[in-house]
Design a protein with these regions (language model features):
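Envelope-exposed proteins and targeting segments
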Residues: 65, 76-78, 128-132
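Polar/charged, Gly/Pro-rich intrinsically disordered segments
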Residues: 113-158
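Bacterial N-terminal signal peptides that target proteins for export
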Residues: 1-7
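N-proximal, solvent-exposed amphipathic alpha-helical segments enriched in charged/polar residues
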Residues: 24-70
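Sterically constrained small-residue positions within well-ordered secondary structures
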Residues: 11, 60, 71, 123-127
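Sec-dependent N-terminal signal peptides
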Residues: 7-13
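Mature extracytoplasmic domains of secretory-pathway proteins
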Residues: 71-123
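C-terminal motif of bacterial Sec signal peptides marking the signal peptidase cleavage site
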Residues: 16-19
Length: 158
């Protein structure tokens, strides 16, 4: 009798271990994190600055002496300061600004997944809610001082 009980106990323990294995099937719908469209997600502009400066390859833009970014969730603006060297063509500056805005938009989309990333045709949706003020200087001379409000188009095209 004791042998039967021990055998039955071992069998039940074995069955309970076998039934507790993980499932390796495909879920019918992926689990997605969602947030309400009106929920405020604060943007970390210091992180955007770090990401953008890291991604802007100095070899691609050797004419840029310095680049700094900051921003404010209160004003919904990104502030960009860039200093360039002498004799930079307008075309080169346009390419730089285009790439810079794409990098800013993509960095913002990483922080708030409701923003779409930039494509070849657009800068994504980050600049629909966030504006940008950029100042390009050459020494003491201001080359460009432009404010683009949220939703407005940029004054340069590639």
């Amino acid at each position: 009798m004791l042998k039967k009980r021990a055998c039955l106990l071992c069998l039940m323990a074995l069955l309970s271990l076998v039934s507790c294995k993980p499932k390796y099937g495909v879920n019918s719908a992926p689990v997605m994190t969602t947030a309400a469209a009106d929920q405020v997600i604060l943007i970390d502009f210091d992180q955007i600055s770090d990401d953008v400066i890291e991604n802007m390859n100095p070899e691609d833009f050797p004419f840029v002496k310095s680049l700094s970014l900051s921003g404010s969730n209160d004003t919904h603006m990104v502030e960009v300061q860039a200093e360039i060297v002498e004799n930079v063509s307008p075309e080169a500056l346009t390419i730089f600004l285009d790439q810079l805005m794409r990098e800013i938009s993509n960095a913002g989309a990483v922080q708030d997944f409701r923003y779409s990333k930039s494509t070849d045709e657009s800068y994504g949706s980050f600049f629909q809610k966030i504006g940008v003020h950029y100042v390009i200087t050459r020494g003491e001379e201001t080359v460009e001082d432009v404010t683009v409000q949220p939703g407005e188009t940029f004054p340069f095209t590639v």
